Amino acid sequence: VLSTPMPASAAEQADVRSSDRVLRSGWSNGPLQEVQSWQDLRWQMMQSQPSRDEDAQWVLELQSRDGQAVREVRMAVPATAPEDGVMTPEWWGLRGPWMAPVLGELVPGGVAQQAGLRKGDTVVRIQSRSVPDAVALRASVRASGAEASAAQVWEVARRGKPGLLLIEVQPRRVE
């Protein structure tokens, strides 16, 4: 199951989405191989040689989170050559397996703790933008910490509490 792809990557341009499950993958001019795990996908990509066919694309057969729809996406070969000639999932713009946007240990006295966030909180939205996975959560936190910005409203689900809590978080620039 995949997390949010890197912005402007081959994966994002092909419409890979957070929580898509990879069923099979391979070159468009060859057979697709079954994928059992993130490591399996990584291995397939790394063992594959770049196609000599200029029109070849890397194909992912994906199943939506609800398990209903299966679709095929085709990723165009990125313009930059892979590092050391090895085609990794990251080269295609895939960031890793899906993980829930749940807060882990908080920095004592840090911004999150001061705002009232707690370990185990599930972040649903930040400033009305959906947070589909841990990758998207980390990207949002990094972006807000890059420079001082206005307070943000985080919508979180907390164990033992019905509904969503609205928590105002004041980002601080991190050196």
Which sequence ranges carry the predicted segments?
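PDZ peptide-recognition modules
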Residues: V1-E175
